[in-house]
């Protein structure tokens, strides 16, 4: 295990302590967050000299749950005072580049993909990372049965969460005899063992060399040889699915596995209910634990898999065809790495691309070295240890919303906070996407010029929501004359953002995340997610639509003569989609936040911008009444992430500050005439404000799509 991770004692310079349960913990005062023009990564300082020369900042202490050492504030007596106190604290969390950073955590299993990819490619994991990953996973272990769920907040275990978390802990040094792993192993065997994990887990277990490739349903790269006009071409699939599939199909076609070591040999004996050499892996290709079979595959998919394995591969798959397909997907991998500066679309594609590059270019290839340099951008330190973010950060998204919140709280009129807004504007200006990617048709990338990404321009994927909110925030700041902005975003670039949004609307009136819907809804027949759904089609989302419509409405008020007819038509169709998406009970489902409270806030704000309020709009009234019906006895709102799965409102056990704030804003945007529900919500928020103006992290607020 030496080439994968150095010993904790040597690589953390003896600063590891033991918690009461015997687990190791690093010295949190030695962690630093690097801000490289917006790119984020955590570093552990090993020497005392580094610690002295590089003092820990307020924002680092905040993320780590340490005392920020900021002065206590007088307890707020009014909502305005509470907002001013929050503004005072929040401004201290701004990073040098002008952004705000935060965790973006949800699915637990993605951590395993990154760790396994690093392990099999001899990419050293810093010892401090290993210590904190172990802490994080044990903190997420389900108390009831000893397993892990697929989501970081899951209270029920799954096969994919259990097998992959178990594997990570073993790779990072936890012994098989640890009582917590004994419980997890027992549960995994009750699920049927690793042979009954979803296909995505099996794929990574094969890469690790602890499962045979016969157990994995095929990821045929030949799909990419079909013409783009083919309705089932991967170019028509949802962006994340086709991007992940590309590198995964290359690895599958090569049937590559890690050579193995003592740990992987032990895992072969631990993950299964019978001796490894006696397992009929081919017979378990479609085996799946019932707890993970949330979205059963259609019979058509099962038939295609059988025909591929039983007929096509043994009788018709010629080496020349396989090599041609491998060349095709390799070209796409190279282009993806180039266009994202080896960051990748997500940690899933990042991990698979690293393995593909390792296979193609060798352990010291330039592509492998580049992937190693950017690997750390996905890891995030929390109070409970080190997690893996869903992306390389949410810098643009958080900064855009931070600007709107600060302006609403009066930051622009307070000289103390004006420099904060100026820095935020500079960050947004720096990370607007100024050109399309090269050969965008060849690599199936949607035009992005003028848009904004989720994280940074280096990763470079334009997102409709971020473009909408980035445009609104930039215009809002540039409309404040006394800020004295020296580098304004030219009107031409603001128009580019408008063009970007106009180019994204689907025929439904709605907006997707990255691009227009390219394929037929019938692609849903090819769903293969098993434990997650809606992975094949580019769907419209309420929150993407509201962001686009709100931005276009705001732009047209400042520039009424630019593309007036097109903007009017687009916003009218978008408003129609928002109303059509409202459920019979008045709620809106939000996929990228939790969930009905999240979408309700955006929907009611957008309707209000269009002149539709509680007094004038049935949709607004129904939306407000839906949210009011969910208010808890303490005056707050709390919604569980389970709403995402069940597509109905699921109450959290406790009120949540963030969701209470969302609903209060929604009601105020809508002009709801009753003051008391809003007052009760604000009192709940104020009651949980801490002495320095901050609030503690509660349940996760971010969504994970249709999982």
UniProtKB/Swiss-Prot annotation:
Positions of the site: Transition state stabilizer?
397, 454, 592
> What are the entry keywords?
Isomerase, Repeat
A single Pfam family it belongs to is SQHop_cyclase_C
Q: From start to end residue, where is composition biased (Polar residues)? A: 1-20
Show me the PFTB repeat boundaries.
Answer: 130-173, 494-535, 571-608, 620-661
| EC number of the protein | 5.4.99.-
Named in its record, the pathway it takes part in is: Secondary metabolite biosynthesis; terpenoid biosynthesis
Loss of function: phenotype: Abolishes the production of arthripenoids but leads to the accumulation of a new compound that possesses a sesquiterpenoid chain with adiol group at C12' and C13' position.
Which GO biological process annotations does it have? Answer: ergosterol biosynthetic process; triterpenoid biosynthetic process
Keyword Magnesium listed: no
Q: Does the keyword Repeat apply?
A: yes
Q: Which domain of life is it from?
A: Eukaryota
Indicate the family of this protein.
Belongs to the terpene cyclase/mutase family.
Function, as annotated: Terpene cyclase/mutase; part of the gene cluster that mediates the biosynthesis of the meroterpenoids arthripenoids. The pathway begins with the HR-PKS atnH that catalyzes two chain-extension steps to form a reduced triketide, which then primes the SAT domain in the NR-PKS atnG to initiate three more cycles of extension to give a linear hexaketide corresponding to the polyketide part of arthripenoids.
Q: What is this protein called?
A: Terpene cyclase/mutase atnI
Gene name, per UniProt, is atnI
